[in-house]
């Protein structure tokens, strides 16, 4: 089933996108900082969410991992 129609898969994809963008921005900030608007601005926004809300994102990742490993 597609990640769009399965809510848990959609949350997993969003969390992975946020974590990946934050990691890429920590390695090469200029790569994401030049595209703050438009379609590619989504990646910059995900990186900002990952940086500013990192404790909450980390808790969500742990909860999602627990859910995937032990609940399903």
From Swiss-Prot:
Subcellular location: Golgi apparatus membrane
Residues linked to a glycan: 35
Extracellular side: 27-53
Signal peptide segment: 1-26
Cysteines paired by S-S bonds: none
GO cellular component terms listed in the entry, alphabetical order: Golgi membrane
Keywords from the UniProt entry: Glycoprotein, Golgi apparatus, Membrane, Signal, Transmembrane, Transmembrane helix
InterPro entries with a match to the protein in the record: KISH_domain, Ksh1
GO biological process, one term: intracellular transport
Protein name: Protein kish-A
Taxonomic source organism: Gallus gallus
């Amino acid at each position: 089933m597609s990640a769009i129609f399965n809510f848990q898969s959609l949350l997993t994809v969003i969390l992975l996108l946020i974590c990946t963008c934050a990691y890429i921005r920590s390695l090469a900030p200029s790569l994401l900082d030049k595209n703050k608007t438009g379609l590619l601005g989504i990646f910059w926004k995900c990186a900002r969410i990952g940086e500013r809300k990192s404790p909450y994102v980390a808790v969500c990742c742990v909860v999602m991992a627990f859910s995937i490993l032990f609940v399903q």
